[in-house]
Amino acid sequence: MKTNYEEVRKENNPPHIKLCTLSGNSEVGRNCSFIEDRQNIILVDAGLSFPEQELFGIDYLIPNLDYLKKNKHKVRAIFITHGHLDHIGALPFILPLLGFPKVYAGSFASELIKQKLKEYRIIDNLFLIKCLDLE
């Protein structure tokens, strides 16, 4: 007896998990990825990059956030791997756009994030959770 894969999949209801890189995969900078299941999105990094000289007048580039804007009700948190601008630089733009989700970062990255958000005067809305640094 043949079994239809789609029927088995529906019956077993396996977890649907997506890993998507918004930017930073084939370039240096603008690191931003997310993990998504049916009800949740967790971002990993929120970086920016600096344009080449031929993009005169543009100060920095951030990831394309269209998908996240459409699904902001699912965004639960942002995990920061480290405090370089190519991993935290877009936070001042991403956080307000997504309703200020929780940000998880190590102690050094946390301090850099606070400084960056003070520059943009949005530090009061930050929900930052310091993670233990592994040695």
In which residue ranges do the predicted regions lie?
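Metallo-beta-lactamase
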Residues: 2-11, 109-135
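Conserved structured core elements
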Residues: 16, 29, 85-88, 107
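Divalent metal-coordination and catalytic microenvironments
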Residues: 19, 35, 45, 82-83
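Short Gly/Pro-enriched turn/cap motifs at secondary-structure boundaries
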Residues: 23-25
